[in-house]
């Protein structure tokens, strides 16, 4: 049975602890017991604990005018003892738990300060540190990374999550967004058809930096979080609502716009959320793994493959027939939507979606029928030995390239032509050669890859 105060069984328990420069807080009813107890009485300042906390304890913002919410938990009446002159609170005093609006006025340089709250009946305080960082763009400001030169313009939006004002002021955020854009276009056919896209980003400031998980909580702009079982999750409605503020994005073209969220983490584990109407959010972490499971591989597989191309996974997890798996229903669902052109449930040469490539001399050296895909070794077929949709290599198969180009033409308001496709098609043979030399085929995929998730209907913001 425990005692209060806890017995100090070793006289050296607090050795090295400075006992005169901080206050030891304990429940009020046992203050005198602690002051008299062996070991504990060595602390020079022992006082009653009071309930007064501010959430968050730290606010970071850019130097434009901005607002943040604070929650003050107090056991009684409280007041603001002091604050920076460039900070305004919606209330300077109150009673018990209170939600406050903190307004930070615009500034021109870095500055920091402290807001101190005090319980009125006690000499007891808590604080919130406030930082304001100098940056050339404001919170949520939309930036154009590229304007289209061909067609009517296809929206491609890169946003980060888990980047706080300090990260952004250092230039980390914009550097990452530009790098992600270049990775997206560093694979065919996107490299060739790059001029069809309008590319945007916006200064999405998160209260905290990093991404949370099961045992870690992070307050971020879009709520991106790692889970144990279903990959990355986010606040999809918040993301769509945010993107709809970009002038060229509207209800009529949201389903043809691709959103790429880059969580501020080097962990692997990308995933794409897709809606039946075509809307998509690709979560693409900055993986620190080696090729082909690096950040480039995730963007090209998740964003370029799933999010825009509507391609299916070709990697294998299970040595079994797909007919025995509940995922067969998901496969057929995708097929009914006109997706997954790179996969087939039949191995008959004249019935697969890529039949026109098999006997075409320009493609017949690599295009055939290979069994295995959609996580299963049997009952599902792919067109080439290896591709980006298997293990993230920097190469899309011929049928995948065609499916992507067809979608580009559709969204750009142009008519697709197979002859034009072939004329402009670039295989990327160097990357294909690298894949066949360095990688294994038909083996299990990296352990924490997640298939895309299909949601019914349209995003709820459009309903």
Where are these regions (language model features)?
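Solvent-exposed loop and capping/linker segments of extracellular ligand-binding repeat ectodomains
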Residues: 1-50
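Beta-sheet-dominated interaction scaffolds and their linkers
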Residues: 50-71
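Surface-exposed binding patches on compact interaction domains or structured appendages
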Residues: 51-53, 73-101
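A short beta-strand micro-motif common to beta-rich folds, especially ectodomain repeats
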Residues: 110-121
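Propeptide-to-catalytic entry region of secreted or membrane-anchored zinc metalloproteases
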Residues: 133-250, 421, 426-458
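Short pre-active-site segment immediately N-terminal to the catalytic Zn-binding motif
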Residues: 169-173, 277-303
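Catalytic zinc-binding patch centered on the HExxH motif and its immediate surroundings
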Residues: 210-218, 239-256, 260-283
């Amino acid at each position: 049975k425990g005692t209060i105060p806890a017995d100090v069984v070793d006289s050296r328990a607090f050795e090295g602890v400075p006992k005169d420069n901080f206050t030891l807080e304990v429940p009020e009813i046992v203050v005198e017991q602690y002051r008299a107890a062996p070991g504990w009485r060595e602390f020079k300042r022992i006082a009653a604990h009071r309930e007064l906390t501010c959430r968050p304890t730290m606010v970071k913002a850019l130097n434009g005018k901005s607002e943040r919410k604070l929650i003050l938990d107090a056991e009684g009446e409280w007041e603001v003892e002091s604050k920076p002159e460039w900070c305004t609170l919606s209330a300077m005093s109150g009673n018990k738990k209170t939600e406050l609006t903190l307004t930070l006025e615009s500034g021109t340089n870095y500055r920091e300060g402290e807001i101190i709250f005090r319980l009125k009946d006690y000499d007891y305080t808590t604080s919130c540190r406030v930082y304001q960082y100098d940056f050339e763009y404001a919170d949520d400001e939309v930036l154009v990374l590229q304007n289209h030169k061909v067609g009517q313009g296809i929206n491609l939006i890169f946003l980060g999550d888990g980047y706080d004002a300090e990260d952004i002021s250092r230039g980390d955020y914009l550097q990452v967004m530009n790098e992600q854009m270049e990775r997206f276009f560093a694979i065919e056919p996107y490299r060739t058809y790059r001029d069809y896209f309008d590319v945007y980003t916006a200064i999405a400031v998160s209260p905290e930096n990093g991404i949370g998980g099961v045992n870690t909580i992070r307050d971020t702009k879009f709520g991106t979080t790692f889970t144990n079982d279903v990959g990355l999750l986010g606040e999809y409605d918040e993301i769509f609502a945010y993107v709809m503020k970009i002038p060229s994005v509207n209800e009529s073209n949201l389903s043809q716009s691709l959103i790429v969220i880059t969580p501020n983490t080097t962990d692997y584990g990308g995933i794409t959320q897709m809606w039946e109407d075509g809307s998509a959010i690709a979560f693409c972490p900055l993986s620190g793994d080696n090729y082909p499971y690096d950040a480039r591989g995730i963007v090209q597989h998740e964003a370029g493959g799933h999010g825009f191309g509507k391609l299916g996974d070709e990697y294998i997890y299970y040595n079994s027939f797909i007919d025995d798996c509940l995922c067969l229903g998901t496969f057929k669902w995708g097929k009914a939507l006109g997706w997954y052109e790179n996969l087939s449930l039949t191995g008959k040469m004249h019935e697969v979606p890529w039949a026109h490539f098999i006997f075409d001399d320009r493609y017949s050296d690599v295009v055939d029928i290979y069994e295995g895909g959609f996580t299963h070794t049997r009952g599902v077929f792919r067109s080439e030995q290896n591709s980006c949709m298997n293990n993230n290599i920097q190469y899309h198969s011929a049928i995948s390239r065609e499916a992507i180009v067809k979608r580009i033409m559709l969204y750009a308001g142009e008519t697709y032509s197979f002859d034009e496709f072939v004329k402009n098609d670039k295989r990327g043979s160097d990357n294909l050669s690298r894949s066949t030399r360095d990688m294994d085929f038909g083996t299990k995929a990296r352990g924490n890859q997640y298939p895309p998730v299909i949601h019914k209907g349209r995003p709820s913001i459009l309903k």
